[in-house]
């Protein structure tokens, strides 16, 4: 009989209920390099100590249940249990705490974002002892991140495929998002691409509806891409949304896109699910397709600052599951995004190594050990006057996506695309020559518009458009 077995036998089994904190709150624990670390914003119910609330979260997401069970004696709980190792109050908030938790790596299936989230957030958010709970951050150890393929290609490979360097990429979502026939949809794509955009895009809910079946849309968009490439000499693409009701149908659509010779497909990764997304990412790497990711449904999960999952966690999960682009807010447009927080998760998407920085919402140092990076996509309510700020905020490794800011041009889609391309090139040139985009941005756009009637018309249309609301998600 092993010493471990003898110890368990000597303790014996005592039925009943005991406080979680007696087992799962371990303030003396020293985290291991292989642990997955999590930071939870915990709001306990009145009368519930923060140590008990934090330990309850750990128990339910690892080895615990509501009562003592005799099968606890058949394994080593000390090896497999999650541990709440630190709790700190949230400044300026009453009865709210950040609880830090360490999970042993053996609790998780290799290469499965689905299993990771099922374990960490799958059941605990409904606990009665908690008024609210939010997952604010994760530290993914190299030992776990190396079990994931990650993005199909990554930033450098994408630039090499497109032969485009030294500037952000330009995109446009085709509008109206629903109701166009496939041929008219393809015409809109062609006009935008020939005007100077790098990409056009299906919107998130364009799948295969009665007014435009997916196969027809794919064919007409491929024709538009080929024609625009022939006219401009540039490589072009359209994000063909492969999201479908089943994984099999999704892959079938991706296969058809590859057969048409297009460079990129798209997936709604939250509504489609992480298992489907990872499957599509693997197919895209094996078959040379780039993968654009839309985050439809994210605000249901991340909008409330006290409950849910912060988008920085969803962004990390996407980098693991796989995607070459992902929408990341704009800071300046119609969709919410506070600058420091947004740039925090943009770095988590693009960089190899990111230092802990609570001022930007980064709770843990993250080492991706060369997992390919993801291009952040700025999209939502942006137009030519935003171009200097977007270029300064997001830098070259980004996609700036103008939907209404292209298609709403008074002269049509192609002039709208020209206006955006001229504005971008002017901002990049000014920056490269030492200009200050933050201070001189409006003047740079005005000067460029003297030489571009398309840009001048766009400047006139959108000169008064602003989206000035207080961001809900603050540190």
Swiss-Prot record:
Task: List residues modified as N6,N6,N6-trimethyllysine.
Answer: 14
Needs which cofactor?
A: Mg(2+)
GO cellular component terms, semicolon-separated: chloroplast
The principal location of this protein is: plastid
EC identifiers of the protein: 4.1.1.39
Gene Ontology biological process terms from the UniProt entry: photorespiration; reductive pentose-phosphate cycle
Alphabetized Pfam families for the sequence: RuBisCO_large, RuBisCO_large_N
Which InterPro entries would you find in this protein's record? RuBisCO (IPR033966), RuBisCo_large_chain_AS (IPR020878), RuBisCO_lsu_C (IPR000685), RuBisCO_lsu_C_sf (IPR036376), RuBisCO_lsu_fd_N (IPR017443), RuBisCO_lsu_N_sf (IPR036422), RuBisCO_lsuI (IPR020888)
Site (Transition state stabilizer) location in chain = 334
Q: Which SUPFAM superfamilies match?
A: RuBisCo, C-terminal domain, RuBisCO, large subunit, small (N-terminal) domain
Q: Which reaction does it catalyse?
A: 2 (2R)-3-phosphoglycerate + 2 H(+) = D-ribulose 1,5-bisphosphate + CO2 + H2O; D-ribulose 1,5-bisphosphate + O2 = 2-phosphoglycolate + (2R)-3-phosphoglycerate + 2 H(+)
What does the entry's cofactor note say about binding and number?
A: Binds 1 Mg(2+) ion per subunit.
Subcellular compartments: Plastid, Chloroplast
Which residues does this entry mark as bearing N6-carboxylysine?
Answer: 201
Post-translational modification note: The disulfide bond which can form in the large chain dimeric partners within the hexadecamer appears to be associated with oxidative stress and protein turnover.
Q: Of which family is this protein a member?
A: Belongs to the RuBisCO large chain family. Type I subfamily.
- The protein's name is Ribulose bisphosphate carboxylase large chain
Native species of this protein?
Answer: Notothixos subaureus (Golden mistletoe)
């Amino acid at each position: 009989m092993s010493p471990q077995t003898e110890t368990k036998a000597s303790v014996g089994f005592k039925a009943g209920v005991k406080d979680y904190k007696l087992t799962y709150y371990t303030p003396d624990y020293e985290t291991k390099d292989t642990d997955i670390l999590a930071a939870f914003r915990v709001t306990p119910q009145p009368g519930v100590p923060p140590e008990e609330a934090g330990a309850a979260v750990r128990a339910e997401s690892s080895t615990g249940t509501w009562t003592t069970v005799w099968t606890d004696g058949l394994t080593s709980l000390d090896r497999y249990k999650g541990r709440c190792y630190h709790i700190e109050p949230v400044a300026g908030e009453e009865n709210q705490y950040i609880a830090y938790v360490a999970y042993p790596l053996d609790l998780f299936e290799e290469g499965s974002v689905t299993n990771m989230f099922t374990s960490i957030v799958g059941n605990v958010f409904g606990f009665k002892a908690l008024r609210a709970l939010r997952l604010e951050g994760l530290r993914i150890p190299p030992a776990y991140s190396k079990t994931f393929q990650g993005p199909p290609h990554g930033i450098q490979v994408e630039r090499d495929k497109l032969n485009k360097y030294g500037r952000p990429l330009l995109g446009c979502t085709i509008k109206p998002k629903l109701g166009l026939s496939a041929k008219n949809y393809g015409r809109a794509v062609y006009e935008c691409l020939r005007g100077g955009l790098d990409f056009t895009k299906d919107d998130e809910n364009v799948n295969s509806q009665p007014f435009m079946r997916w196969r027809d849309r794919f064919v007409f968009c491929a024709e538009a891409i080929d024609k625009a490439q022939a006219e401009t000499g540039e490589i072009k693409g359209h994000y063909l949304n492969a999201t479908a009701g089943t994984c099999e149908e999704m892959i079938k659509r991706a296969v058809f896109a590859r057969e048409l010779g297009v460079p990129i497909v798209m997936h709604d990764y939250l509504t489609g699910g992480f298992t489907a997304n990872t499957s599509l990412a693997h197919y895209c790497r094996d078959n040379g397709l780039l993968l654009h990711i839309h985050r439809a449904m994210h605000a249901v999960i991340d909008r409330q600052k006290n409950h849910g999952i912060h988008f920085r966690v969803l962004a990390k999960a996407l980098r693991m599951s796989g995607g070459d682009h992902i929408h990341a807010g704009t800071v300046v447009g119609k969709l919410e995004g506070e600058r420091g927080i947004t740039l925090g998760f943009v770095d988590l998407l693009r960089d190899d190594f990111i230092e802990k920085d609570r001022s930007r919402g980064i709770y843990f140092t993250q080492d991706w050990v060369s997992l390919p990076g993801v291009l952040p996509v700025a999209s939502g309510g942006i137009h030519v006057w935003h171009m200097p700020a977007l270029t300064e905020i997001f830098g070259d490794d980004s996609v700036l996506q103008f939907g209404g800011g292209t298609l709403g041009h008074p002269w049509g889609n192609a002039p709208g695309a020209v206006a955006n391309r001229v504005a971008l090139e002017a901002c990049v040139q000014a920056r490269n020559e030492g200009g200050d985009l933050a201070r001189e941005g409006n003047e740079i756009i005005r000067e460029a518009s003297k030489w571009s009637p398309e840009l001048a018309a766009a400047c006139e249309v959108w000169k008064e458009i602003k989206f000035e609301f207080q961001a809900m998600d603050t540190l």
